[in-house]
């Protein structure tokens, strides 16, 4: 039994195994209807709980479709239904769910909730997102880069904007997959020192550059994310926009990157805020391949968790 809690907590060779599996499963589905089962149906007879304390469209649909394609069934539980940590303890919830299902995916706010769930569950637990990290997204992003440009090792990845949970998982991936990483954004939104330190300890070059044009110079991949959360009050939204406007990914900024550089955004996006529509729909953009690859990467993660 394997938990998938964070990229840096997983062996490098096993991450490579998952990545190769994701590419192979995607290739095997080429031309098939979306609802047609995979030939081997590795999850036949298995039940997967999808817990959403924090709601999501992409995570829910991609995991649900992935389980169904592999022959399994899903049970989707919202935060309101679960009352995580209120009343019944998370530990007891984990123990009970483990009696009903074969695998648990949880998308939650606090990392502590994820870790407690994994500590007490007797089935594998997958981190669908916490406020600190988003490893499933980055597995899809690395897959997408490899699909278009080959190995990501030795490449320069630039993150523009807020050093958030997705940025944190990119730093974990830099250490595991061997690419260099530059963050450009206001100092108040720098990624946590812990994440930067991890990538550096693994021998990767990690830099912080306040000038976005200098940061993006020679980049192989430019990535950004939303500037605001759905839960942010209006005052915080205005403050964030003022802070981050200089770090918008537009055509002028992308021109500083390599001619064959890719652009990624995990979506949903606020078009013409963190990135212009011209970039999102332009020749560098692979955002919809990136979105699709959540499905294939997560299928590979589920197989690995169950030892299939």
UniProtKB/Swiss-Prot annotation:
GO terms for molecular function: amino acid binding; ornithine carbamoyltransferase activity. One of its GO terms (cellular component) is cytoplasm. The keyword Ion transport does not apply. Keywords: Amino-acid biosynthesis, Arginine biosynthesis, Cytoplasm, Transferase. The keyword Amino-acid biosynthesis applies. Pathway: Amino-acid biosynthesis; L-arginine biosynthesis; L-arginine from L-ornithine and carbamoyl phosphate: step 1/3. This is Ornithine carbamoyltransferase. L-ornithine binds at residues 165, 225, 229-230. InterPro entries: Asp/Orn_carbamoyltranf_P-bd, Asp/Orn_carbamoylTrfase, Asp/Orn_carbamoylTrfase_sf, Asp_carbamoyltransf_Asp/Orn-bd, Orn/put_carbamltrans, OTCase_ArgI. The gene is argF. It is found in: Cytoplasm. It comes from Cereibacter sphaeroides (strain ATCC 17023 / DSM 158 / JCM 6121 / CCUG 31486 / LMG 2827 / NBRC 12203 / NCIMB 8253 / ATH 2.4.1.) (Rhodobacter sphaeroides). Gene3D superfamilies: Aspartate/ornithine carbamoyltransferase. Belongs to the aspartate/ornithine carbamoyltransferase superfamily. OTCase family. Reversibly catalyzes the transfer of the carbamoyl group from carbamoyl phosphate (CP) to the N(epsilon) atom of ornithine (ORN) to produce L-citrulline. GO terms for biological process: arginine biosynthetic process via ornithine; citrulline biosynthetic process; L-arginine biosynthetic process. Its EC number is 2.1.3.3. Pfam families: OTCace, OTCace_N. Carbamoyl phosphate binds at residues 56-59, 83, 107, 134-137, 266-267, 294. Its main location: cytoplasm. It catalyses: carbamoyl phosphate + L-ornithine = L-citrulline + phosphate + H(+).
């Amino acid at each position: 039994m394997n938990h998938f809690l964070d990229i840096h907590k997983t062996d490098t060779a096993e991450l490579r195994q998952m990545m190769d599996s994701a590419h192979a499963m995607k290739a095997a589905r080429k031309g098939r209807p979306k609802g047609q089962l995979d030939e081997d149906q590795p999850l036949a007879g298995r039940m997967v709980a999808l817990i959403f304390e924090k709601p999501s469209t992409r995570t829910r649909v991609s995991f649900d479709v992935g389980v169904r394609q592999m022959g399994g069934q899903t049970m989707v539980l919202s935060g309101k239904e679960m009352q995580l940590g209120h009343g019944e303890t998370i530990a007891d919830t984990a123990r009970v769910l483990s009696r009903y299902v074969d695998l648990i995916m949880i998308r939650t706010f606090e990392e502590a909730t994820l870790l407690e769930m994994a500590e007490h569950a007797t089935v594998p637990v997958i981190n669908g997102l916490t406020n600190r990290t988003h490893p499933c997204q980055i597995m899809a992003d690395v897959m997408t880069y490899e699909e278009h440009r080959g190995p990501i090792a030795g490449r320069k990845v630039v993150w523009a904007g807020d050093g958030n949970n997705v940025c944190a998982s990119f730093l974990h991936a830099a250490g595991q997959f061997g690419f260099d990483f530059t963050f450009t954004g206001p100092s108040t939104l720098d990624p946590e020192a812990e994440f930067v330190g991890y990538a550096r300890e693994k021998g990767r070059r990690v830099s912080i550059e306040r000038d976005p044009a200098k940061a993006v110079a020679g980049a192989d991949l430019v990535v950004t994310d939303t500037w605001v959360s759905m839960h942010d009050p209006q005052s915080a939204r205005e403050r964030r926009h003022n802070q981050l406007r200089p770090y918008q990914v537009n055509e002028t900024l992308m021109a500083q990157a390599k001619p064959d550089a890719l652009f990624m955004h995990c979506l949903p996006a606020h078009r013409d805020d963190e990135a212009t529509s011209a970039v999102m729909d332009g020749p560098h953009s692979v955002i919809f391949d990136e979105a699709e690859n959540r499905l294939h990467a997560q299928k590979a993660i589920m197989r690995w968790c169950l030892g299939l």
